[in-house]
Amino acid sequence: MKYKYLLSIVFLMMCSAIAYGQAKKPTLMVVPSDAWCKEHHFEQAFDNQGTTEMIPDYKAAVSTSKELNAVISKINILMADRGFPLKDLQQNVKSISNLSAEDRLIRSKTSGASITESPLDRLRRTAKADIILDIDWTVNTVGPKSSITYNLRALDAYSNKQVAGAEGTGKGSFSAELPVLLEEAVQDHMDAFVERLQAHFDDLLTNGREVVLDMRIFDTSAVDFEKEYNGFELNEVIDNWLSDNCVNHRFSKSDATETMILYEQVRIPLYKTNGMAQDTYGFARELARFLGAAPYNIPVKTINRGLGRCLLILGEK
């Protein structure tokens, strides 16, 4: 009996280990930090509807810096060894470069109103990584020995909130190879870092992904958010739909007037009922289809504003 009992315990432990190994893991993409890009002059000007902003130029960085590519490759290897799927920055930058300039401008078919999307938002939307690993580093040299000081941050690609971090300085080494110095520096902190990544993703699986829905009314529209349908104002109708479709009914109505509503901390499922991955645009399109059907019959233009934010404009397309 005791022998059978021990066999049962071993079997359960093996099943737990297999289940852990097969647990869903977040998709990662490694990028250089904004500070690193600025220090090494990898920046570009972006015209954000009349306001010039300086943003990282990842295309120039991965095309020019061998050090950056070596660092990204090493982190990719370290994370892949721990079972995390990865999106490669260089390949995603290339795919975005192949998109035509005309596709970067979205216009209303009726009014001609336009909204632009920044290269960084487009990169995140195209790559569809769950978490961005933001890396900055400095090589220190003392006599014949070198070490590396690093700062690795994990950012939720949808909410841009930091979910994990690791920083420190490695021990002095006679090796001059950057990937070796990086691996020596991060090895003591990597397991705890990975645990925090997985804990965040497990929370997303349980409580949904956090996104933002920005709702507006076209100037030419005959409808606003105070128009009533069967005794309920349109904004109440939308509130009820979100409550029915958000994970655990969780969302926050941050601001609202008769012509705009801002929903933050909208918790959407990671996966659709058919098992396909769910994103902000897909969730927003479900809401748009609901509003476009009877009894509302409201045309809705749905526009991506980055991976974790969507703009819905009611009244025309």
Where are these regions (language model features)?
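Sec-dependent N-terminal signal peptides
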Residues: 3-15
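Short, flexible helix-coil linker/hinge segments at the edges of structured domains or between repeats
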Residues: 92-110, 155-178
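C-terminal basic regulatory modules in eukaryotic proteins
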Residues: 287-317
